[in-house]
Amino acid sequence: MPLLYICLHNGRDTSIFANAQMFYPAAGVMLAFLLARRQGTPKRFYILHIAAAALMLAMSVLSAFLPQESWLNIANFVIIIASVLGWIFLLTEKKTKREDYGLHLHGKFLTAFAICAYFLVVKTGMVFLSVALQGGDAWAEYLTYWQSSAPWLMALVLVPNFFLSFLPFFGEEYGWRYYLTPALQGRFGARRGALAVGVLWGLWHLPLNLFFYSPDTSLQSITAQLVVCVTLGVFFTFAYEKCGKNIWLPVVLHYLNNSMVLVWTGTADISNQIISWTDVAISAIMYGVVFLPFLAAKCYRKNK
């Protein structure tokens, strides 16, 4: 957090910190498994992810003291190389190791497709509704944007881009959904465990809320972050359970949630936002209505 403050105070780009932070949850789980000498771990993939996380951390630290515009480009290059190697290591790993450590690639693909389609439709609808609430001029401008080729071309690019940049999204979901959610559900029950993970997931973003996403309206940003993480956590956990504990579905959903911002808004810049309490209230209502009903799903009715 102090490094983020230094970068912000000196007017430097803090995007690399957001990218690096996504690697840490899975890296912590993997490091713990390796140090515990657990049998049958997919060591190559684990070591790759830990090394990528360490490299991203090192670059984040260096960017605070050795400022240059190329740090983010270097980080993106590391993500691409690590993601490609990650696929190679996963696809050449023994099936039993993938199965034992939640990395299996099979699953209910039609169900997964339907869940992704639902997510895209409702999230896109939420964006359109948010713009409509801003008034006629904003609405007209937004409709003009969608009449251009830009959002459609960017949406197409996101398909191959997933395979070149999946590792940070996996980094969060393997930590939150694969490891921590079952651990807390075993202690507090299915619903309360998932909700607790959502709160922790939201608080995990605290440094970014303070120094990256919305430094000038940080309290609103923190509140909105908690709303989003709790509600999306409910849905991501439902998706994970519905498709036979397939970690790749929440990874894809997380990727869509973050990367579709480029399609929905025409920009990938999510820093220095100004968030009002009205924005927070609208977000809470929309996310609550769309995602909290999944708490009634079968996977949440066990061990209440």
Short names for language-model regions:
Residues 198-219:
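Membrane-helix boundary elements
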Residues 216-222, 243-248, 252-304:
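C-terminal membrane module of polytopic membrane proteins
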Residues 46-55, 194-200, 248-259:
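Central hydrophobic cores of alpha-helical transmembrane segments
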Residues 121, 170-198, 212, 238-246:
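Membrane-interface helix/loop boundary segments of multi-pass membrane proteins
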Residues 5-93, 111-114, 141, 151-160, ...:
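Alpha-helical transmembrane segments in multi-pass membrane proteins
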Residues 23, 113-117, 158, 162, ...:
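Residue-level signature of the transmembrane alpha-helical core
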Residues 34-41, 91-99, 293-304:
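Membrane-interface capping segments at transmembrane-helix boundaries
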Residues 2-10, 59-70, 129-136, 207-214, ...:
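Juxtamembrane "helix-exit" motif on the non-cytosolic side of transmembrane helices
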